[in-house]
From Swiss-Prot:
<comment type="similarity">
    <text>Belongs to the RNA polymerase subunit omega family.</text>
</comment>
<dbReference type="InterPro" id="IPR003716">
    <property type="entry name" value="DNA-dir_RNA_pol_omega"/>
</dbReference>
<keyword id="KW-0548">Nucleotidyltransferase</keyword>
<dbReference type="GO" id="GO:0006351">
    <property type="term" value="P:DNA-templated transcription"/>
</dbReference>
<keyword id="KW-0240">DNA-directed RNA polymerase</keyword>
<keyword id="KW-0804">Transcription</keyword>
<dbReference type="GO" id="GO:0000428">
    <property type="term" value="C:DNA-directed RNA polymerase complex"/>
</dbReference>
<dbReference type="InterPro" id="IPR006110">
    <property type="entry name" value="Pol_omega/Rpo6/RPB6"/>
</dbReference>
<comment type="subunit">
    <text>The RNAP catalytic core consists of 2 alpha, 1 beta, 1 beta' and 1 omega subunit. When a sigma factor is associated with the core the holoenzyme is formed, which can initiate transcription.</text>
</comment>
<dbReference type="GO" id="GO:0003899">
    <property type="term" value="F:DNA-directed RNA polymerase activity"/>
</dbReference>
<dbReference type="GO" id="GO:0003677">
    <property type="term" value="F:DNA binding"/>
</dbReference>
<protein>
    <recommendedName>
        <fullName>DNA-directed RNA polymerase subunit omega</fullName>
        <ecNumber>2.7.7.6</ecNumber>
    </recommendedName>
</protein>
<dbReference type="InterPro" id="IPR036161">
    <property type="entry name" value="RPB6/omega-like_sf"/>
</dbReference>
<dbReference type="Pfam" id="PF01192">
    <property type="entry name" value="RNA_pol_Rpb6"/>
</dbReference>
<keyword id="KW-0808">Transferase</keyword>
<comment type="function">
    <text>Promotes RNA polymerase assembly. Latches the N- and C-terminal regions of the beta' subunit thereby facilitating its interaction with the beta and alpha subunits.</text>
</comment>
Amino acid sequence: MSNVAENNDGVYDAPTGITAPPIDELLKHVSSKYALVIFAAKRARQINSYYQQADEGVFEFVGPLVTPEAQEKPLSIAMREIEAGLLDHEEG
């Protein structure tokens, strides 16, 4: 859902939601949208485990490869890493 611009001329602001990074840019790094979902979910799970283990002083997983923004979710971080080409994806 997006918000109507202040001048009420029917022009809409940029949509909110999962738009950054754009899906088209993410799909350049994988073979399909399904592979993207699995790839991003696995990396998000690793990032989440990293944060949980950091509290315990254990570092089994690699932390974020991009600088996380305040309150940024692990899935958003994973997608930014994929867009930046910081992760290698092997299917199979």
